[in-house]
Amino acid sequence: NNYCKIKCLKGGVHTACKYGSLKPNCGNKKVVSYGLTKQEKQDILKEHNDFRQKIARGLETRGNPGPQPPAKNMKNLVWSDELAYIAQVWANQCQYGHDTCRDVAKYQVGQNVALTGSTAAVYNDPVKLVKMWEDEVKDYNPKKKFSENNFLKIGHYTQMVWANTKEVGCGSIKYIQENWHKHYLVCNYGPSGNFQNEELYQTK
């Protein structure tokens, strides 16, 4: 795959072209470890799918107001090594936030990021970071359109349960910055969710 040839809708140079390798590039931050184990990948995928099915079955009582309506077109996600590679390249820059260009040949790619820190030498399990995204459901108003909700409060949740998204792949890095032990998780989603003129899923 020649990522340097991919033209993203938002412009910019593709992350996998710009940085080009899995070598961490974190300046004065001390890298402890990077990458996800096979088990962690399975756990992250299972957490996404368990949550999507909880929403689909109408079992999510949280919301503003809750509960969330059940879905009729919510499929399970599958893991994508390609999306995971691009997510890992971005995570390895130790820059919290979204990269500009991460699309792949077949579709636009969405992204969720999470960062936790502790003064103690402990690092949160990646599933805990995924649950932080799920918790945004408490601010979601299902009686309003997606575009009428406050995106800054709910955007990670909505990407997680976006029905048209089929694949997910994530990357992770743990590093120390000014005595803070940080765990940074990046998940990429394809096809991307969070389109302003669409809805999360079809309600039953």
From Swiss-Prot:
Record CDD domains: CAP_euk
Primary localization: secreted
Domain SCP: 45-189
Disulfide bonds, paired cysteine numbers: 4-17, 8-101, 26-94, 170-187
Entry-linked Pfam families: CAP
GO CC, one annotated term: extracellular region
SMART domains assigned to the protein according to its UniProt record, in alphabetical order: SCP (SM00198)
Alphabetical UniProt keywords: Allergen, Disulfide bond, Secreted
Alphabetized PANTHER family for the sequence: CYSTEINE-RICH SECRETORY PROTEIN-RELATED
Homology family: Belongs to the CRISP family. Venom allergen 5-like subfamily.
UniProt name for this protein: Venom allergen 5
Taxonomic source organism: Vespula maculifrons (Eastern yellow jacket)
Organism phylogeny: Eukaryota, Metazoa, Ecdysozoa, Arthropoda, Hexapoda
